Design a protein with these regions (language model features):
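Long, contiguous, compositionally biased segments that the model treats as domain-scale units
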Residues: 1-145
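Polar low-complexity intrinsically disordered regions
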Residues: 1-3, 344, 452
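Polar/charged alpha-helical tracts
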Residues: 54, 58, 344, 442, ...
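Active-site-facing alpha/beta catalytic cores
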Residues: 77-78, 83-327, 370, 378, ...
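Short glycine-enriched loops at secondary-structure junctions
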Residues: 117, 356-357
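Non-transmembrane, aqueous-exposed alpha-helical and coiled segments at domain scale
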Residues: 307, 313, 319-351, 357-406, ...
């Protein structure tokens, strides 16, 4: 007779977050479909497994110890319509291309993670949006409400969590097929990068591309097992913004009797929801997943230490990742005291730069792009600070796409504002396009090579 799996409903403490303040929370508890939606999510299969989550923790422990580099990228906010094979393969392909370049530059393995298969919600600075005298709830991502500016579309609908779950499942299925079925073959990915370097706009990166080419040919000449290089590990992560969703997908691991969030391998807490006494920190502190926290320019060393005490009291390498999003103008001044305080405490979080969120600008035309030069400058500042302090710059977290969008100004093959009318496609924040993403990877590889 099979012993039933332990239930998260019986595990102590998993619902204490409900008694705390909850920032950015949808107004849907009174919706007639709320209870049924939660009940269904409580019963669905996990999207990821505890063993995979544990493997990611061990990989991130390597990053914390300076033995690997962490790459995370994907959409600002995924859309249900964007979960097609072409769109998903484009994002995965771009991340794989970036990872090959970073692996060569760092001379270290790269932990690859998509900001995918669950990034369907977004925090907003205002609960409401007004257009032409009409005020409606803000768009909070397709797992909460619709983008169209109508009363019907903007209702917070809990049934959208179910669609988000099923869309995430199909996305993860495709990711696993791509990364385990030959799509990730090192030689194929490298050939794509040679095409990038052949563009005259990116001539400065041709030398490194050719060095990688020689390394691949050398491996082949030495009889390397390229069959083993046809597959790769690839993890999924998203911001754990919707606690109703995350709690409903919490499962108790039958091996350890410990709770895991099974909506993703990696979950992070945003800058707007990292209140130490808040619901987000409380729930995620109880899960065994590796956890990230976004740190903005207002973060103090004391803030970081209190977050460590709350989320990583055992000081386990690989448990906690600090994702700094301070802005190019702030990072060289604001980041050092935070790192020093953490170093002096003996904690070993992974340090990752998010060079996107602190660098959004507003143009008179109404568009909100990022400037590629600002993104690059924040990355450069991140590496400079770590070099000066003797600490390890563990990774980069970018909002990007595999498509030829025009949302971030500049780059070696520059995007101009005149392109926005036809190619500015994001429903939320601006993303690096395919070529800009690869250029960032080559630049980071240069910084890593210099550090070595």
């Amino acid at each position: 007779m099979t012993t039933p799996s332990p239930s998260a409903a019986d595990y102590p403490g998993l619902d204490e977050w409900r008694e705390r303040s909850i920032g950015q929370h949808p107004q849907w508890a009174e919706h007639p479909d709320f209870a049924d939606s939660i009940q269904e999510l409580n019963a669905v299969p996990p999207l990821v497994f505890a063993g995979e989550v544990d493997r990611l923790r061990s990989r991130l422990a390597q990053v914390a110890n300076g033995e690997a580099f962490f790459l995370q990228g994907g959409d600002c906010a995924e859309t249900f319509a964007g979960a097609t094979a072409d769109k998903i393969s484009g994002r995965v392909r771009t991340l794989l291309q970036m990872a090959v370049v970073l692996t060569y530059g760092a001379s270290l393995p790269v932990v690859k993670m998509g900001r995918m298969a669950g990034q369907f919600s977004k925090p907003r600075s205002s609960n409401e949006e007004t257009r032409d005298g009409v005020t409606l709830p803000s768009f909070r991502g397709e797992m909460v409400n619709g983008f169209d500016f109508t009363e019907e579309s903007r209702v917070h609908d809990p049934k959208r969590m179910l669609r988000g779950y099923h869309t995430s499942a199909s996305t993860l299925n495709l990711i696993r097929a791509f990364t385990q079925g030959g799509f990730a073959d090192l030689r194929r990915v490298h050939a794509w990068n040679m095409g990038f370097a052949a563009n005259p706009a990116y001539a400065r990166y041709e030398t490194m591309a050719r060095e990688i080419d020689h390394a691949v040919k050398f491996m082949a000449a030495c009889g390397s097992d390229f069959d083993a290089l046809k597959t790769t590990e690839f993890f999924a992560g998203h911001e754990a913004l919707l606690l109703d969703y995350e709690r409903a997908l919490t499962r108790i691991d039958s091996r350890t009797n410990l709770p895991y969030g099974t909506s993703a391998h990696f979950l992070w807490i945003g800058e707007r929801t990292r209140d130490l006494d808040g619901a987000h920190v409380d729930l995620l502190s109880r899960l065994r997943n590796p956890i990230g926290v976004k740190l903005g320019p207002g973060t103090s060393g004391e803030d970081a230490l209190r977050l460590i005490d709350a989320l990583d009291p055992e000081r386990e390498p690989g448990r906690l990742t600090f994702i700094t999003r301070m802005g190019a103008k702030n990072i060289r001044e604001k980041l050092p005291p935070v790192i020093r305080a953490v170093e002096e405490s003996g904690a070993k979080p992974v340090w990752v730069t998010d060079p996107m969120h602190g660098n959004t600008v507003s143009l008179p035309s109404g568009y909100k792009p990022r400037r590629f030069e600002d993104v690059v400058d924040e990355v450069r500042g991140f590496f400079e600070v770590h070099r000066e302090l003797g600490t390890f710059p563990g990774g980069i977290h970018v909002e990007m796409t595999g498509d030829d969008v025009a949302e971030c100004l500049g780059g070696s093959d520059p995007v101009a504002e005149s392109s926005f009318a036809e190619r500015y496609e994001t429903l939320c924040d601006p993303r690096l396009n395919h070529m800009q993403s690869l250029e960032i990877a080559f630049l980071v590889a240069e910084y890593l090579s210099e550090q070595n």
